[in-house]
C-alpha cells in the first residue's frame, strides 16, 4: 500500500482561516468585545452639549474623560465651543467625587446648570461687576423659558439654591465644595479661607493653566484657542491701567467678551502648595493638566501634624525645544523664542564659513549677510532641487534682528576662542603673575568686575539665553496639635477648626439650607423676579436666594432670633449662638417629621392629590423600629391596635391636625408635636443672668437640694421632663397641686406658655438633659438674675434626635460649677462597678473615680443569660431599660402581645432606653440586651456606663440574649 505524504502545516496555513471552528472562535471573541463596548456605553453618562465640536475636539474629550460621558451634541453655534463643553464635563466630574445626595457648595458656578439637573448644590454667585449681573439675568430668563416650554417637568422642581454673596461671606455649611473656573478672583489663599468659613474638608476645582505664564508675558493655549497676555499694574494711576498685574484671556477669532483676572491670584495656584489657618492646614494637589485645563484638589487636615515642607515642580514642556534670542536693542525688541534646532544649524553654518574670521570682522555687511543666509538655510533645506521646511519660521518683524543677534553670538565665540588660545601661550613672568590673580589676565576684565560700565554692551549681553525646563517651589507649614485653643469669642464665631473632621460627614447629608444673615456693614442688593411661569418669589434676606423649605404648621415670624445692634461680649455671644442653633434644630426636627411621613405615605401608594393607599404592608415592617407607626382609617378605626392619642397626622394635605373621618399616617413624632411652638418661644435676646452648675454624681441628693433651696415667693423650679416635674410636685405640693403647677414647670412649658409671675431665681433639675440654647431661652423668658442647674455633667447629656444636624453649642457653658461626689442612693457594688468602668474607658479626670456612697446595700447587681426575650416574663413591679431603640421596640412588642399591665404608670413609662430614663429613681431595674456581643458597658458612651445607677435597692439584673 503506497503511503501518501502531505504537509499538514502548509494545509493549515493555506486554509486554516476558513475552518468553521476558527470562524466560530473569532465570532465569539468579536461578540464579547462588542457586548463589552455596549455595556461601557450604557454605563457612561449622557451629557447634552450645545456646542459644535470637531472630530479632533471629540477625540480630546474622549481622551480626557475616557468613557465617563457620552456626548450628545445639539450642534448650536456657540462661542469657544471646546472650552464650554469641557467646562460642562468638568462640573459633572467634580460632583461625582462626593457622596450622592450630599449637599455640595459651588463657588462661582452656574446655579441654572444645577437647577436643571436637580443637583443638591448651593451656588455662591457674587456680583463682582455688571457682567455677573447680566449672567444672573440670563439665567433667570432661561429658567422662565424652561418652565413655560415644559411646565409638566419644571414646575415640580424646587427653586434654585444660590446666593449673591461671596464664598467667604456665605454661611451655608458643607464638607464638600467645587470651584469650576471660579478661583481666578479668589486665589489659593482666598479659596482656603472660604473653605474654612464653610467647614469644607475637600474641594475639587478646575482652571485654565499655562506654565509659560511664569516665564513669558504672552502665550497661546492652542487646544482652547485662547490667547493670554499679561498687563503690568499701575498702582499710582499714571497710565490708566488696573492697580495690580492682570492676565487677559482672549479667544482667537471670536469677538466675544474677554476675561481678565488678577495675575497674583492665578500665580498662587502655580507657586503655592499649602496654607494654614490656626490648627487647620490646607494642602493643594494638582491632578490632571491637559488641553490647557488644570484639575486640582484642596484638602483640609487637622490634628497632630509635624512641621511640613511641601515641594512641587512646574514644568515647561512647550519651551523645552526653544531658546531665547535677545536682540541687540532691548528698548525696542523683546525676547524672541527660536527653535533650538534652528540655532544649532546657524551655529554650524557659522563654524563652517569658508571666509576667514579676520575678514568677517572687517567686512560687517558681508558678515551680516552670512548670518541672514544661515538663518534662511536653517529654515529650509533643498533636496534634489526641491525646497522643504526644516525648521520653524520666524515672525517677519523679528527675522533680521534674530539673524543679526545669532551672528554676533557666533562672532563673540570666535573672540573668546582667540583669547583662550592666547592664554595658553607663555608670555613671561609678568603675564603669569597677573593670570594668578585672575584667569584671563586682562586688565579690562579685572576693572570691569568692579566697574561694570567699563565693559562694552557687546561683551556683557547674552545673545542666546537657555530657557528653564522646570521650576521648583517649596512651601512650609507649621506644626499643629490636636488640642483646641479657642477662647469664648472664637467659640462664638466657631469656624470648626479641630472639630472639622469630626462633624464633616454628619453635615454632608444635611440638605437644610441656612441662608446667610444680613450683615450690617455689607451692602446688599435684593433681586425680585415676577413671572407667571416661575411663580411668586418669596422675600428672603438681602443678597440670598434659596430653595424652598418645608414650613411647619402655624410658624410665625414675629419672634425670630436676630443679631443685636450692640456688640456682645464672649459669654453673651455664645448664648445667642446657642439659642439660634436650638431654634434651627427644632425647625429641622419638624421638617424631618414631615419628610419621613411623606416618604412613608409615598411607599404606601399615597399621592399629594389622593388619600387612597395601595398597600399598607410597609407599615408592618416600620413598626419593628417604631411601634407607634399606625394608619387612621376613614371610619375612625386604626390599622393596628392603638392606645395613644396623636396631636397631628399626615396625608395628602400635609402634616397637621386631622378630623376623625380622615385617612392619615402617624408615627412617634406625632404624639407630641410641639417643635414649632417651642421654636416660636425662643426669645431674640440672650440672658444676662448668671448660670451656675451643681455637678453631682448619681444619687447625690440633687432633687433634695432643690427642695431645700426653694423659696416660694421668688423661685421657679424647672425640670427637663414631665416625670421629674411630677415627682417634685408630689414631694413639695402634695396637698396643693394647683399652686405647685405654677411653681414647678417643665422646660417646654416655659418656652410655650411663658411665666405668669416675677422670678428672681430659677432652679433647674437635670439640666444636662437640655440644649444649652433652651436653657438660655428659659433664663431670658423668666427674667431671673440667676439660674442654678442641678445635674451630672458626665452622665447622658443632650442628645440630638437628628444625627445629621451639626451641633456646636449644645453643651453647657456655666459661669461656675461645684462638684458633689457623695451618693445616697447607689449601693456599694454599683459604686465599685462604675469605678471599674470609668478606668476601663480611660476617664482619668472623672469625678466617679473618687465617689463614695452612704448606702448600706452591699449587693444589688446580677446578670442572667436567656436564649430569647420570651424566656423572661415581664414583671409588673420592675422597670426595664434597653441600650438601643431596637431592643426597646422588641420589649414593647412583647408587652402588647402578652397584654402586659404594669402596677404603676403605663407601658411606655416602665420600658425605656437608658437615655430616656435619665434622672429617674425606681426600686427595681432590669437592663435588657438583645445580643451577646462584646459588652457595650466598657465603651466611652455615657448612657451605657450609667445604666446601672437607677435602682435604689437590691434589684438590678442584666439580661443577655444568647
UniProtKB/Swiss-Prot annotation:
A single MF term (Gene Ontology): ATP binding
Any one cellular-component term (Gene Ontology): membrane
Family membership: Belongs to the bromoviridae replication protein 1a family.
Enzyme Commission number(s): 3.6.4.-, 2.1.1.-
Polar residues bias spans: 546-561
Residue segments, region Disordered: 536-561
Keywords: ATP-binding, Helicase, Host endoplasmic reticulum, Host membrane, Hydrolase, Membrane, Methyltransferase, Nucleotide-binding, Transferase
The keyword Cell membrane is annotated on this UniProt entry: no
SUPFAM superfamilies: P-loop containing nucleoside triphosphate hydrolases
GO BP terms in the entry: methylation; mRNA modification; RNA processing
Protein name (database record): Replication protein 1a
Domain (+)RNA virus helicase ATP-binding per the UniProt entry, residue ranges: 667-820
PROSITE patterns noted in UniProt: ALPHAVIRUS_MT, PSRV_HELICASE
Pfam families reported in the protein's UniProt record: CMV_1a, CMV_1a_C, Viral_helicase1, Vmethyltransf
Alphavirus-like MT domain ranges (all copies): 71-270
Keyword Transferase: yes
Ranges for region Methyltransferase: 79-356
Domain (+)RNA virus helicase C-terminal: 821-962
Annotated segments matching region ATP-dependent helicase: 693-941
Record membrane topology: Peripheral membrane protein
Subunit and partners: Interacts with RNA-directed RNA polymerase 2a.
Function according to Swiss-Prot or TrEMBL: Involved in the virus replication. Contains a helicase domain and a methyltransferase domain. The methyltransferase domain is probably involved in viral RNA capping. Involved in the formation of ER membrane spherular invaginations in which RNA replication complexes form.
Subcellular location: Host endoplasmic reticulum membrane
Amino acid at each position: 500500500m503506497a503511503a501518501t505524504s502531505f504537509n499538514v502545516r502548509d494545509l493549515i496555513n493555506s486554509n486554516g482561516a476558513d475552518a468553521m471552528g476558527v470562524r466560530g472562535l473569532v465570532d465569539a471573541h468579536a461578540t464579547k468585545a462588542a457586548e463589552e463596548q455596549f455595556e461601557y456605553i450604557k454605563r457612561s453618562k449622557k451629557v447634552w452639549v450645545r456646542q459644535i465640536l470637531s472630530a479632533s475636539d471629540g477625540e480630546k474629550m474622549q481622551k480626557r474623560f475616557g468613557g465617563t460621558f457620552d456626548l450628545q451634541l445639539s450642534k448650536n453655534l456657540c462661542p469657544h465651543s471646546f472650552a464650554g463643553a469641557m467646562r460642562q464635563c468638568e462640573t459633572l466630574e467634580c460632583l461625582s467625587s462626593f457622596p450622592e445626595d450630599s449637599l455640595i457648595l459651588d463657588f462661582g458656578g452656574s446655579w441654572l446648570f444645577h437647577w436643571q439637573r436637580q443637583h443638591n448644590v448651593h451656588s455662591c454667585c457674587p456680583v463682582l461687576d455688571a457682567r455677573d449681573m447680566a449672567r444672573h439675568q440670563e439665567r433667570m430668563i432661561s429658567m422662565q423659558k424652561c418652565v413655560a416650554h415644559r411646565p409638566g417637568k419644571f414646575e415640580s422642581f424646587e427653586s434654585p439654591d444660590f446666593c449673591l454673596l461671596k464664598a467667604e461671606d456665605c454661611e451655608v455649611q458643607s464638607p464638600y465644595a467645587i470651584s469650576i473656573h471660579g478661583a481666578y478672583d479668589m486665589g489659593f489663599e482666598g479659596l482656603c479661607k472660604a473653605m474654612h468659613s464653610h467647614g469644607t474638608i475637600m474641594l475639587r476645582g478646575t482652571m485654565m493653566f499655562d506654565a509659560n505664564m511664569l516665564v513669558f508675558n504672552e502665550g497661546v493655549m492652542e487646544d482652547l484657542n485662547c490667547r493670554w497676555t499679561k498687563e503690568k499694574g499701575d498702582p499710582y494711576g499714571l497710565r490708566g491701567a488696573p492697580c495690580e498685574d492682570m492676565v487677559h484671556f482672549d479667544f482667537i477669532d471670536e469677538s466675544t467678551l474677554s476675561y481678565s483676572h488678577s495675575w497674583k491670584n492665578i500665580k498662587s495656584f502655580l507657586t503655592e502648595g499649602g496654607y494654614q489657618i490656626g490648627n487647620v492646614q490646607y494642602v493643594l494637589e494638582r491632578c490632571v493638566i491637559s488641553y490647557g485645563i488644570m484639575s486640582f484638589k484642596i484638602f483640609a487636615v487637622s490634628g497632630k501634624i509635624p512641621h511640613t515642607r511641601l515641594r512641587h515642580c512646574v514644568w515647561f514642556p512647550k519651551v523645552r525645544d526653544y531658546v531665547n534670542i535677545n536682540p541687540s536693542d532691548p528698548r525696542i525688541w523683546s525676547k524672541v523664542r527660536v527653535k533650538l534646532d534652528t540655532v544649532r544649524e546657524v551655529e554650524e553654518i557659522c563654524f563652517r564659513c569658508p571666509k576667514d574670521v579676520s575678514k568677517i570682522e572687517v567686512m560687517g555687511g558681508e558678515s551680516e549677510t552670512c548670518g541672514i543666509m544661515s538663518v534662511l538655510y536653517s529654515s529650509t533645506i533643498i533636496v534634489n532641487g526641491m525646497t522643504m521646511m526644516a525648521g520653524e519660521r520666524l515672525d517677519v518683524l523679528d527675522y533680521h534682528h534674530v539673524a543679526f543677534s545669532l551672528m554676533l553670538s557666533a562672532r563673540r565665540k570666535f573672540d573668546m576662542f582667540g583669547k583662550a588660545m592666547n592664554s595658553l601661550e607663555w608670555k613671561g613672568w609678568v603675564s603669569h603673575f597677573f593670570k594668578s590673580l585672575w584667569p584671563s589676565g586682562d586688565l579690562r576684565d579685572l576693572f570691569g568686575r568692579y566697574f561694570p560700565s567699563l565693559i562694552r554692551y557687546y561683551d556683557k549681553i547674552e545673545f542666546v539665553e537657555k530657557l528653564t525646563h522646570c521650576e521648583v517651589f517649596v512651601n512650609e507649614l507649621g506644626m499643629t496639635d490636636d488640642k483646641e485653643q479657642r477662647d469664648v469669642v472664637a467659640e462664638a464665631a466657631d469656624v470648626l477648626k479641630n472639630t472639622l473632621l469630626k462633624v464633616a460627614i454628619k453635615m454632608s447629608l444635611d440638605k437644610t439650607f441656612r441662608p446667610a444673615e444680613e450683615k450690617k456693614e455689607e451692602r446688599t442688593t435684593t433681586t425680585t423676579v415676577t413671572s407667571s411661569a416661575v411663580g411668586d418669589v418669596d422675600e428672603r434676606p438681602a443678597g440670598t436666594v434659596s430653595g424652598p423649605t418645608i414650613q411647619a404648621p402655624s410658624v410665625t415670624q414675629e419672634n425670630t432670633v436676630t443679631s443685636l445692634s450692640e456688640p456682645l461680649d464672649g459669654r453673651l455671644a455664645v448664648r445667642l449662638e446657642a439659642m439660634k442653633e436650638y431654634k434651627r434644630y427644632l425647625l429641622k426636627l419638624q421638617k424631618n417629621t414631615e419628610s419621613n411621613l411623606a416618604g412613608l405615605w409615598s411607599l404606601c401608594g399615597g399621592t399629594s392629590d389622593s388619600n387612597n393607599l395601595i398597600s399598607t404592608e410597609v407599615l408592618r415592617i416600620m413598626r419593628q423600629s417604631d411601634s407607634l407607626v399606625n394608619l387612621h382609617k376613614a371610619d375612625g378605626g386604626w390599622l393596628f391596635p392603638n392606645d395613644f392619642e396623636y396631636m397631628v397626622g399626615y396625608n395628602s394635605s400635609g402634616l397637621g391636625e386631622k378630623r376623625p373621618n380622615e385617612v392619615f399616617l402617624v408615627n412617634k413624632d406625632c404624639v407630641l408635636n410641639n417643635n414649632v411652638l417651642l421654636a416660636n418661644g425662643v426669645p431674640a435676646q440672650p440672658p444676662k443672668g448668671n448660670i451656675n452648675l451643681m455637678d453631682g454624681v448619681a444619687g447625690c441628693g440633687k432633687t433634695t437640694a432643690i427642695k431645700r433651696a426653694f423659696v416660694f415667693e421668688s423661685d421657679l423650679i424647672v425640670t427637663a421632663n414631665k416625670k421629674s416635674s411630677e415627682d417634685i410636685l408630689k414631694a413639695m405640693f402634695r396637698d396643693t397641686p394647683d399652686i405647685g403647677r405654677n411653681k414647678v414647670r417643665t422646660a417646654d412649658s416655659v418656652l410655650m406658655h411663658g411665666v405668669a409671675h416675677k422670678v428672681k431665681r430659677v432652679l433647674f433639675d437635670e439640666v444636662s438633659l437640655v440644649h444649652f440654647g433652651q436653657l438660655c431661652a428659659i433664663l431670658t423668658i423668666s427674667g431671673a438674675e440667676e439660674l442654678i442647674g442641678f445635674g451630672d455633667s458626665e452622665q447622658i447629656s443632650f442628645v440630638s434626635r437628628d444625627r445629621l444636624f451639626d451641633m456646636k453649642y449644645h453643651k453647657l457653658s456655666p459661669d461656675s460649677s461645684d462638684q458633689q461626689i457623695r451618693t445616697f442612693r447607689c449601693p456599694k457594688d454599683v459604686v465599685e462597678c462604675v469605678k471599674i468602668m470609668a478606668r476601663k474607658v480611660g476617664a482619668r479626670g472623672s469625678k466617679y473615680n473618687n465617689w463614695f456612697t452612704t448606702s448600706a446595700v452591699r449587693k444589688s447587681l446580677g446578670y442572667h443569660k436567656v436564649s430569647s426575650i420570651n424566656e423572661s416574663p415581664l414583671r409588673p413591679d420592675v422597670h426595664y431599660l434597653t441600650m438601643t431603640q431596637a431592643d426597646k421596640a422588641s420589649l414593647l412588642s412583647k408587652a402588647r402581645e402578652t397584654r402586659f399591665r404594669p402596677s404603676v404608670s403605663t407601658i411606655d413609662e416602665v420600658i425605656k432606653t437608658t437615655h430616656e430614663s435619665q434622672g429617674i429613681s425606681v426600686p427595681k431595674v432590669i437592663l435588657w440586651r438583645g445580643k451577646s456581643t462584646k459588652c457595650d458597658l466598657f465603651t466611652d458612651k455615657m448612657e451605657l456606663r450609667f445604666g446601672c445607677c437607677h435602682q435604689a435597692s437590691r434589684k438590678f439584673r442584666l439580661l443577655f440574649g444568647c
